[in-house]
């Protein structure tokens, strides 16, 4: 192969002259020529369009929108639930207020004729204020429960226990009960006094029946 790159020697030159290399032969016998990078590739001959070349990721196909889109419920319809609505608090409040106010008003009625009219009128005005605040939702649950206990003690003539509940309400809930609790306190005192008088009258009525007349012996 080396002989291909060497020109034939000059006959006129000496035997020891260096050979002359032929660069033209090197370029002619070199490897296959490369296509320049700037040269465009010819379009295909069949005429079919070429797909555009993209360097990004392939597009993602989105599913078509569902035809059964959620729609709001029609007007006037409510979702069906298995929970029953709670009982009306108004009815429960009216029941409790009658359980408390009715015994107090009855106790005030018992005091008429034994208590001064001015005192009875003041107690009646305080009880009316209690009813108004109770019905208007201005009293808390603890106050209502303690008033129910106070009435029970009053009905059983447990005056000291009723008075203790009255004092606890004045200490713990003075802002709620201060306007009408004075009348309840006075009613407890008047009812206690009336009960003591009735007890004395009963005792005075029973004692003469048990007394014996001197010198008179009751038949056995």
From Swiss-Prot:
Modified residue annotations for Phosphoserine: 48
Protein's GO biological process: apoptotic process; negative regulation of myoblast differentiation; regulation of transcription by RNA polymerase II
UniProt keywords, alphabetically: Activator, Apoptosis, Cytoplasm, Nucleus, Phosphoprotein, Receptor, Ribonucleoprotein, Transcription, Transcription regulation
Localisation: Nucleus; Cytoplasm
Residues covered by region (Disordered): 1-89, 194-220
Transmembrane spans: none
Entry-linked Pfam families: SRA1
The keyword Lyase belongs to this UniProt entry's keyword annotation: no
Any GO CC annotation of this UniProt entry: ribonucleoprotein complex
Compositionally skewed regions (Basic and acidic residues) per UniProt: 194-206
An MF annotation (GO) of this entry: transcription coactivator activity
Residue stretches of biased makeup (Polar residues): 208-220
Biased composition (Pro residues): 55-76
Subunit structure: SRA1 RNA exists in a ribonucleoprotein complex containing NCOA1. The RNA also forms a complex with PUS1 and RARG in the nucleus. Interacts with AR.
Family designation: Belongs to the SRA1 family.
Remarks, miscellaneous: Appears to be the first example of a new class of functional RNAs also able to encode a protein.
Function: Functional RNA which acts as a transcriptional coactivator that selectively enhances steroid receptor-mediated transactivation ligand-independently through a mechanism involving the modulating N-terminal domain (AF-1) of steroid receptors. Also mediates transcriptional coactivation of steroid receptors ligand-dependently through the steroid-binding domain (AF-2). Enhances cellular proliferation and differentiation and promotes apoptosis in vivo. May play a role in tumorigenesis.
Protein name, as recorded: Steroid receptor RNA activator 1
Designated gene of the protein: Sra1
């Amino acid at each position: 192969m080396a002989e291909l790159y060497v020109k034939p020697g000059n006959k006129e030159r000496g035997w020891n002259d260096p050979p002359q290399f032929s660069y033209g032969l090197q370029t002619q016998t070199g490897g296959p020529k490369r296509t320049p990078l700037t040269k465009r590739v010819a379009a295909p001959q069949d005429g079919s369009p070429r797909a555009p070349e993209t360097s990004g990721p392939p597009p993602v196909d989105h599913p078509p929108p569902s035809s059964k889109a959620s729609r709001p419920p029609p007007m006037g319809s409510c979702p069906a639930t298995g929970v029953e609505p709670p009982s009306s608090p108004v009815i429960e409040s009216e029941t409790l207020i009658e359980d408390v106010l009715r015994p107090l008003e009855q106790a005030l009625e018992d005091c008429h004729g034994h208590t001064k009219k001015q005192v009875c009128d003041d107690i009646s005005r305080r009880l009316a204020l209690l009813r108004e605040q109770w019905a208007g939702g201005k009293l808390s649950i603890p106050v209502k429960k303690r008033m129910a206990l106070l009435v029970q003690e009053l009905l059983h003539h447990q005056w000291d226990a009723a008075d203790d509940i009255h004092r606890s309400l004045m200490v713990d809930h003075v802002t709620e009960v201060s306007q009408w609790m004075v009348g309840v306190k006075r009613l407890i005192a008047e009812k206690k006094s009336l009960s003591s008088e009735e007890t004395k009258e009963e005792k005075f009525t029973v004692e003469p029946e048990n007394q014996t007349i001197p010198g008179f012996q009751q038949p056995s």
